[in-house]
Amino acid sequence: SILILPAWLDVPEKFLTRKIIRLDPGSAFGTGSHPSTRLCIEALDNDPPLGQTIADLGCGSGILSITALKLGAHSTFSVDVDSLAISATKINSALNDFSENLLNVFLGSIEEIEANMPRKKIDLVLCNILAPVIKSIGPGFEKIIGHKGKVILSGLLVEQIEELKEFFLPLGWQVLEIKTKDQWALMVLNMDSP
């Protein structure tokens, strides 16, 4: 139900019924073509985040935050350590007509989300970054996630699935779902019984 278009193209008539995401990725990661990004978009499309508050860690171009909002999320808190990604996310947010109170963007990491979210609890964490970075910030997920909240991890290689399971299980996380595309994997976690 999602169509990702470069900002400068018109929507082809046969796709007018889809949710359109306009992007000008610049130099930030996230055009929608990478398998890890596609896995995340498919996960959001299959289980829309209606009314949820989202954290997008390593937001890149903002594509996952924008997708979540297009699919009914209440708001997003997006962070990246790259200032070019922050600029790209702000530009793409404006291209898709989202105000700053819907798509909140911060330079930094999980600490900025913790410091800036009014409800103090995120419903869904999107984390499409490489496995070593996921492991470095993973222990902080429970500081921002609410009861029954979920985490969608992507950006990991298929051969890293077991390593990440072994990392998160002792922290109290349970694996709800694993999907793969090419050599890339997506893992959905939560803190409660499925």
Q: What spans do the regions from the language model cover?
A:
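Conserved SAM/SAH cofactor-binding pocket of Class I
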Residues: 27, 31-110
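Structural signal for conserved beta-strand scaffold positions within catalytic alpha/beta enzyme cores
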Residues: 4-6, 22, 56, 107, ...
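Hydrophobic residues in well-ordered beta-strands that form the structural core
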Residues: 5-6, 78, 153
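Short, conserved glycine- and acidic-residue-centered signature motifs
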Residues: 22, 29, 33-37, 130, ...
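Structural motif
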Residues: 1-3, 19-21, 53, 75, ...
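Non-catalytic substrate-recognition/targeting regions of SAM-dependent transferases
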Residues: 1-30
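S-adenosylmethionine
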Residues: 47, 81-192
